Each structure stands twice: as C-alpha cells, then as structure tokens.
From Swiss-Prot:
This is Xaa-Pro aminopeptidase 3. Its cofactor is Mn(2+). The keyword Chloroplast does not apply. Binds 2 manganese ions per subunit. One of its GO terms (cellular component) is mitochondrion.
Length: 506
C-alpha cells in the first residue's frame, strides 16, 4: 500500500544500527539469553492460544506461532543493550523500560472492535491481552543488558471471564511468555516510587501513549514529576523500531507464510472476476480466501478500485460496479501470526487486457522488475525511488503521455506517480515509520516495491486512450546477501498468466 513521501531525518540511526551486531556478539558471550526457568503452562484456556490448548498452532516453548520464549528474551536483551549504548555517561543510573499494551476499543456501547495488541509491546513479550504493562528493569550494580522482565496483567475474574473469555492471569503470563515475574495490574503503582527516584532513568513513549487510561493513571504523573528533575523520561520508540527493522529467520518465515496465502487469495479473486462485478464482492472474496487459508485478519482495509477509481490511491469505499472492459486495482494483505503482507495487482475483470491497458501495464511491470533488481545491501529505498522516477519519466515519454524534456521528467513522474516506491514491512504495514528511507538496506530488512502510473479520466494532457487507467504492481521483498527474496512471488503479474487465470473454467 502506498505511503506518503515524507521521511524523518535521523542521521544517527545508521551508525547505531551498524554498531548493534558487534554489541550482540558480546552480549551473547556475557549474558544468558534464556527466559526465566520454564514453568508448566496451566492446563486451561488462557487469554491467547498456548501450546496446551492450541497444539495445532504452537509448539512447546513458543509464545506465538513460530516464535519461542528464547527469541522474545533475545529481543528484550537487545533492547537493553541499546539502552545501555544510548545512556553513555549515566553509568551509575538504574534503567527501567515501560511499554503499555493497547486497550480494548469500542465501536458502540458494549460492542468491541476486534482486539489488536500494540506491536511494540507484542514484539517484546508476545502477550496478547489488553490493559497490561511490560517493565524491563536493570539490576542495581549490574551492567546492562542484564535485567528483569515483569508483566503487570489483569487479574483472573470469573465474572468478567464469563462474558469476555478467559484471562491468563499472572501464572499463565509467566508460563507462556517466559518473563521473570508477573503481577496484577494494580500493583504497578507500588513500582512508581522507585521510578521517581533521581537515580532511575525511565524509558517510555509519553508523547504517543498506546493506552490512554494507563498513561493517565500511572505514567503521566510520573512523566510530569520526572520533567521537573534532571533525569527526564526518555523515549524508547526509536530503539524498538531499530530492532524491528531487521527481521530474524523466524520472522521471515512468518512473512513467507503471509505472502504465500495472500498470493493464493489473489489468484482465487482473479478467477472470480467476471464483468460486470461489484467491488464489494471482490473485497469479500479476497478476505474469505485469506481467512480460509489461516490469516487472522486483513492487514488493512483493501483497495478494490475499478476503472478510474484506481487513481484514488487509498480508495477503500469498494462499493461500485466494475464495468466490462475496466481493470480493477486490488491492494490487499493479511496478518498471519503477527506479521503482515502487502501486495497489489491490477487486472481486467473480463480477463483480457485492451491494447492501451496492456501498454500501460507492461510499462509499469518493466519499471517494477528494474526496481526489484536494486533491492540489495547498500542501496536504500530513496535510491530505488529515484530510479523509479527516472524510469517512469522515460516510459511516460515513450507512451506519448508526456513530451517533456529530460530536465522536467522527474516532475512529470511525480505527477503520474505521487507516492514513494515503497516502505518497510513487518508487524505493521507501514512498519517502523520513524526509520528513514535513506538507510542503506541490509540483509533481513523487508520492504515493498510498488511503482504505479495513474492517469485520471479528466487529464487532458494525456492521450485519450490512457485516460481513466491506473496501474500499480507491488511485491514484498526480503533483502538478502544475494538476490532478493520475493515473498509474493506466487502472485501472478505477467499478463499472460493473469489472462489465463481469469479465463480458467474450474
């Protein structure tokens, strides 16, 4: 899905990322990365799937599908290593990281939205219940990243559980996630006096709290008190994002699963496309095929844009009829076991590209192929974006859409493709948004590559045959030391393949 062009300028980020690998090799020699001693998971339903109740989803030792207690513990150690590096000059200071869960949001009285955990909280512990707090606390007299991990969670409550379902409680939280300690949520208040001390540096995202009530009850008074001292609260958001930017092999495997099942859903949706057809039907078909293959939810409201509506980049009304002879642009993805996909394909609903549609489609496809070859270590999304604009400018001229000089080709390219070439991808669709696109890519980063050309029907500068056409082609890409790994490789994008799928009979 396209994102805005603006990116924050964070010059120190690159150096910090480069320094992390060396720090981690040292960390692995000096500190245990094992979670707390394994405790038997209660033989009952918890507030989320466990290896006991959902053995078809989780293996023993896993917190979420495919991700073990050891991996979550390693993430926490990496974060505390970054805290140690950021806090140079505060060697005698204790450090406490506080991360809030999401609350339950309601669409109306007593009618909740499907709960989705805050992804920074989820990344660090895997706990999927609302109204919870994760605390990582350094040991006095011991060097970071040595620390204690604590969860503060809702109490077991038979009355509420009758209505809302089971809760993990403190015993379930420890046994499932592998944190060192767990307490009822209200006991967090007893930790606050220690956090107020001048000797304790608190790391917490007070500018954008994920849970307004917990922030108001506990963290806002603490933040205001610390603001009057020399030891102010420091943000932890960017540190977590720097960790999330580079995926582990286990994370990449989850994203491969999401990419594969989304690709299969696209194929079935293409096959179901007959003219005329309602955008709402294709929306429903795509969601069904994702969910039927194991997706938890859609990653975002999909764009299902027929005809000229494809020129509205984030069109999500999806309520119009697509006529015979028109194309549909479907930008969709799913979330599977905490990781998402984000794929775009454009195809004719009657199964046959017209000559102008084929010209424009092939132009975008050639641009996308060229951009994919650039997805290697050392380049950046900004570099790929510049190449995309150059190629679009040339294609616009070749198609007779513009007659501009080379000097003004970039301006024309931005007119007909007003979005960036891509963004980082992971637990979120627009993942790690504070990480600049100017960062050199490195193995383990996952990005999207999504060039497009959009020609509104009222554009009098373009040849009439192209007016009202919009094409975008988007793939999900893992940067490796060798050639890029295309997570969406199973999703057809060659014109012959698309036409063959749309014309199949069974």
């Amino acid at each position: 899905m396209p994102s805005l062009l603006s990116t924050p300028k964070l010059a120190p980020v690159l150096a910090r990322l480069r320094g992390l690998s060396g720090c981690m090799s040292c960390l692995q020699r000096r500190y245990s990365l094992q979670p707390a001693p394994v405790k038997k998971i209660p033989n009952r339903y918890l507030g989320q799937p466990s290896p006991v109740t959902h053995p078809h989803l989780l293996r023993p030792g896993e917190v979420t599908p495919g991700l073990s207690q050891v991996e979550y513990a390693l993430r926490r150690h990496k974060l505390m290593a970054l805290v140690h590096k950021e806090a140079q000059g505060h060697s005698g200071t204790d450090h406490t990281v506080v991360v809030l869960s999401n609350p339950t949001y309601y669409m109306s009285n007593d009618i909740p939205y499907t709960f989705h955990q805050d992804n920074n909280f989820l990344y660090l512990c895997g706990f999927q219940e609302p109204d919870s707090i994760l605390v990582l606390q350094s040991f006095s007299g011991k060097q970071l990243p040595s620390h204690k991990a604590m969860l503060f969670v809702p109490r077991r409550d038979p009355g509420r559980e009758l209505w809302d379902g089971p809760r993990s409680g403190t015993d379930g939280a420890i046994a499932l996630t592998g944190v060192d300690e767990a307490y009822p949520l209200e006991e967090f208040q007893h930790l606050l006096p220690k956090l107020r001390a001048e000797t304790n540096m608190v790391w917490y995202d007070w500018m954008k709290p994920s849970h307004a009530q917990l922030h108001s009850d506990y963290m806002q008074p603490l933040t205001e008190a610390k603001a009057r001292s020399k030891n102010k609260v420091r943000s932890v958001q960017q540190l977590i994002q720097r960790l999330r930017l580079v995926k582990s092999p286990s994370e990449i495997k989850r994203m491969q699963i999401a990419g594969k099942l989304t690709s299969e859903a696209f194929i079935e949706t293409m096959f179901a496309s007959k003219a005329p057809i309602d955008e709402a039907f294709l929306y429903a078909k795509f969601e069904f095929e994702c969910r039927a293959r194991g997706a938890d939810i859609l990653a975002y409201p999909p764009v299902v844009a027929g005809g000229n509506r494809s020129n509205t980049l984030h069109y999500v009304k999806n309520n119009q009829l697509i006529k015979d002879g028109e194309m549909v642009l479907l930008d969709g993805g799913c979330e599977s076991s905490c990781y998402v996909s984000d794929i775009t394909r454009t195809w004719p609903v009657n199964g046959r590209f017209t000559a102008p549609q084929a010209e424009l489609y092939e132009a975008v496809l050639e641009i996308q192929r060229a951009c994919l070859t650039l997805c290697s270590p050392g380049t950046s999304l900004e570099n790929i974006y510049s190449m995309m604009l150059t190629l679009i400018g040339q294609k616009l001229k070749d198609l007779g859409i513009t007659k501009t000089s080379k000097e003004s080709a970039f301006k024309a390219a931005r007119k007909y493709c007003p979005h960036h070439v891509g963004h980082y991808l992971g637990m979120d669709v627009h993942d790690t948004p504070d990480m600049p696109r100017s960062l050199p890519l490195q193995p383990g980063m996952v990005i999207t590559v999504e060039p497009g050309i959009y020609i509104p029907e009222d554009d009098r500068d373009a040849p009439e045959k192209f007016r009202g056409l919009g094409v975008r082609i988007e793939d999900d890409v893992v940067v490796t030391q060798d050639s890029p790994l295309i997570l969406s490789a199973d999703c057809p994008k060659e014109m012959n393949d698309i036409e063959q799928i749309c014309s199949r009979t069974s």
